[in-house]
């Protein structure tokens, strides 16, 4: 079995400029690495007429249960202005105890840590009696149509059972060991267009200004108290993200006014119920103003919570022993691919410190990378000892 080093593998992965939509060969590269340490692999490429094709990878070591899965993504966000970087973002460099490069934090180093952990674990436990799998996508930072969502559908159709999934996203705000994600809020975007009647500002009786209704709707939506939050979740929150009145003249009442809003909601709601509540507000105000309207919704994911159990506490205690910090169980932050995986398996998220993700100069502490590898190794060790005892 080939020996793997987490720093070396992280560097190799970062060298691939796998900005979302561009695989650049990184999935195939990881597949070869996994094959060398005994994994059976399958590259899954999905296409959709409304989006770009995406390569994904599912790999499994062993055939027995339980199946411990690690999920992550190899696509990265664009590096931005290259002149703002001290190094080429796709030629990783180590400086002052940090590995610098695009994806060093989110999340190629986490993948490198887990693959190294599997190598360390399987070397000492050649017949551990279960399975370890990896679900790796090339589209988490993008629209995520042909990524983890379709891999989950594929696994479900094949009746591939995953007993537990650890998602390796950077979950810690400032220090390694601070936070485990046990759920995520739901996310829904609304695009609202209010249709009026264009006219001269001096003759408002001959027109119907759609901005009047739009402003009233947005004000009302911001005033809605959806809930007070729960023990595990923050209160549901709606933010207005765009307002547009396409009108270049000061003496013209516009015929169209539009706005977008995003709502992050907890598990007291579903997107369906929120749509009904919001639609009621829109309809009432538009009727009052004699305006027509059009509303379109897109749902990134529903809110979910993995209730803390023995696996949660085992992972929490394992992290505490290595970092000397007891991780908080949290549902804060944005969406992740856990929203898809939770449909087939209980899942938690734990990875690196996310302070530099998506930033110029993205980096990871070499100490954190080493400790994350140790944490992942110990989690595997404790999981299979407990499950197969």
Which residues does each predicted region cover?
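Active-site metal-coordination/substrate-binding segment of hydrolases
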Residues: 67-133, 158, 368-371
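N-terminal helical capping/dimerization or prosegment-like subdomains
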Residues: 1-80, 256-260, 274-277, 366-368
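A structural signal for short hydrophobic beta-strand segments in well-ordered beta-sheet cores
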Residues: 59, 92-94, 240-243
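Acidic, glycine-rich active-site loops and adjacent beta-strand->loop/helix elements
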Residues: 43, 74-76, 135-144, 168-172, ...
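Acidic-glycine-rich active-site phosphate/pyrophosphate-binding loop
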Residues: 79-94, 166, 183-193, 317-318
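A structural signal for isolated positions on well-ordered beta-strands in alpha/beta enzyme cores
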Residues: 42, 69, 133-135, 294
């Amino acid at each position: 079995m080939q020996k793997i080093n987490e720093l070396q593998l992280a560097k190799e992965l970062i060298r691939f400029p796998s900005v979302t939509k561009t695989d650049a060969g990184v999935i195939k590269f990881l597949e070869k690495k996994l094959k060398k340490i005994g994994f059976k692999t399958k590259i899954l490429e999905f296409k959709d007429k409304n989006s770009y094709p995406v390569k994904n990878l599912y790999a499994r070591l062993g055939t027995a249960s339980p199946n411990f899965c690690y999920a992550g993504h190899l696509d990265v966000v664009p590096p931005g202005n290259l002149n703002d970087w001290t190094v080429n973002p796709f030629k990783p460099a180590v400086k002052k105890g940090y590995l610098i490069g695009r994806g060093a934090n989110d999340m190629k180093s986490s993948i490198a840590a887990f693959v190294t952990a599997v190598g360390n674990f399987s070397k000492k436990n050649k017949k551990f009696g279960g399975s370890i799998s990896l679900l790796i996508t090339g589209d988490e930072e993008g629209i995520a149509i042909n990524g983890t969502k379709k891999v989950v559908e594929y696994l479900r159709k094949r009746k591939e059972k995953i007993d537990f999934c650890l998602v390796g996203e950077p979950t810690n705000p400032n220090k390694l060991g601070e936070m485990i994600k046990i759920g995520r809020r739901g996310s829904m975007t609304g695009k609202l267009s209010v249709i009026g009647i264009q006219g001269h500002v001096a003759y408002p009786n001959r027109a119907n200004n759609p901005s009047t209704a739009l402003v009233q709707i947005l004000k009302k939506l911001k005033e809605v108290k959806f809930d007070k939050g729960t023990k595990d979740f923050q209160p549901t929150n709606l933010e207005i993200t765009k307002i547009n009145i396409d009108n270049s003249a000061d003496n013209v009442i516009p015929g169209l006014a539009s706005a977008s809003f995003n709502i992050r909601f907890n598990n007291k709601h579903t997107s369906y119920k929120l749509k009904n509540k919001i639609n009621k507000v829109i309809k009432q105000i538009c009727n009052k103003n004699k305006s027509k309207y059009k509303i379109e919704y897109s749902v990134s994911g529903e809110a979910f919570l993995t209730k803390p159990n023995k696996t949660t506490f085992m992972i929490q205690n394992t992290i505490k022993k290595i970092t000397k910090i007891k991780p908080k169980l949290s549902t804060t932050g944005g969406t992740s691919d856990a929203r898809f995986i939770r449909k087939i398996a209980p899942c938690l998220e734990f990875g690196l410190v996310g302070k530099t993700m998506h930033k110029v100069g993205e980096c990871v502490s070499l100490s954190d990378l080493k400790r994350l590898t140790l944490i992942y190794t110990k989690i595997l060790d404790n999981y299979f000892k407990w499950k197969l005892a």
